[in-house]
Curated annotation (Swiss-Prot):
The keyword Transferase applies. GO terms for molecular function: IMP cyclohydrolase activity; phosphoribosylaminoimidazolecarboxamide formyltransferase activity. This is Bifunctional purine biosynthesis protein PurH. It comes from Leptospira biflexa serovar Patoc (strain Patoc 1 / ATCC 23582 / Paris). Pathway: Purine metabolism; IMP biosynthesis via de novo pathway; 5-formamido-1-(5-phospho-D-ribosyl)imidazole-4-carboxamide from 5-amino-1-(5-phospho-D-ribosyl)imidazole-4-carboxamide (10-formyl THF route): step 1/1; Purine metabolism; IMP biosynthesis via de novo pathway; IMP from 5-formamido-1-(5-phospho-D-ribosyl)imidazole-4-carboxamide: step 1/1. One of its GO terms (biological process) is 'de novo' IMP biosynthetic process. The gene is purH.
Amino acid sequence: MIQIKRALVSVSDKTGITEICSFLTKHGVEILSTGGTYDALSKAGIAVKKVDEFTGFPEILHGRVKTLHPKIHGGLLGDTTNPDHVKQMESNGIVPITLVIVNLYPFVKTVMKPDVTLEDAIENIDIGGPSMLRSAAKNHKNVVVLTDPKDYESFQNEFTTNNGKISRETAFGYAAKVFSETASYDSAISSYFNKRLGIKYPDKITFAFNKKQKLRYGENPHQDAAFYEPLFLKSQFEALQGKELSFNNMLDFDAAFHVASLLPKNAVSIVKHLNPCGIAFGETVLESFELARKTDPISAFGGIIGIHGRVEKESAEEITKNFVEGVIAESFSNEALEIFAKKPNIRLIPIAKFDEALDELDLRSLHHGLLIQNRDYDLITKDKLKIVSKKQPTEDDLEGLMFAWNCVKFIKSNAIVYTDQNSTLGIGAGQMSRVDSVELGAMKAQKVGLSVVGSYVGSDAFFPFRDGIDAIAKVGAKAIIQPGGSIRDEEVIQAADEHGLIMVFTGMRHFRH
């Protein structure tokens, strides 16, 4: 057990600090402190000694050096179970410090300000705080260290129960928390510096995330899971109503948001198992939803709806006629919320800045490492298209082809989508053979009574053989948009010409694994 006799206190987040220090002084614990923390404790009438009085050395360099002193770090690092340590401490006038309450300068909060300067950021890099935390955490068998105000209550309870002592097991748990905190802090600084320098892929990379919540389970009930949010980006998954978000819900919400956010205003995407099962945009959100749902109403059952716009009463009424897991949109009107409230299990997530909420990096974990890439946000404009067929597209054809192209990029490879000018008709997703995706997309459209005659076909990658083109012609589609780049492009173009199809190349592939 660790007897608490002397505490070093220096905090930026002063939540609960006067309460815990008042508790400590009532139990005879000496308090040492600096700067603003000293002022706050003194103002509250708590007996506290300045660190410079304790060390006999003044604060210097405008406060940059306050606690970096042998009397502080000797008191934190000295192992009082080691006779040599005790002897050296006594000969140098160093006394043990058995409790540290420290949290760090608000670096992340500072650099998230839109007008932050490099100088502001640098002045909010804490040096003394991490040093004290690490010293105390290293010597956790003799020192208790608190860096999270949420731990103050449990500390006080154990202190009271054990007559001023804390178990080494508890101290070890606090120490582990400290090293997570200091690692996260340094990661945030590293990320900020790399961003300032324009370095996307440094030789060594760390990511700082805070645990937002423990999830009931992962992708399947036998898997554990938790949700973490990055320090520099507040989580968008704040539900207005509905059941607790599951692991799979979060994946589908993210996908539905991603699809809708990169399409025109009022666009609607319906997602199931990370695949869109309907995408559309119309004059209103209601029109878009009705068009998107027609693509595959069976798969839309229990799906997640992404809406690039505001959900009004009429849209809410139509959505709630169906079983859906949730809706993510720019906003919801009060009338819409009243309607959704009658279906309390539907999860509702608003993202006010729909166009600005996209993260740049895509991370994929492997059993033996981590893959990082920039996200596939690039869009092709009509002027970049290369018309390779003899038959030329009209302006309306180009609009339809662009819509097909902007849809297919969100579908799992091998991906084929049949569309009209503003809604999907049939989706062939995730097949190992491209021609199978061609046939699947047409079959799914026909299954729900949608005709693909005269439709536009988007393919996420090139056609390796002409069989895909023959299959598209067989169902009566009008035009094809694809990246090109196959060694058999000439054969594929010839097939399009034989069937009187329009074909355009984008020069950009959109694999999605």
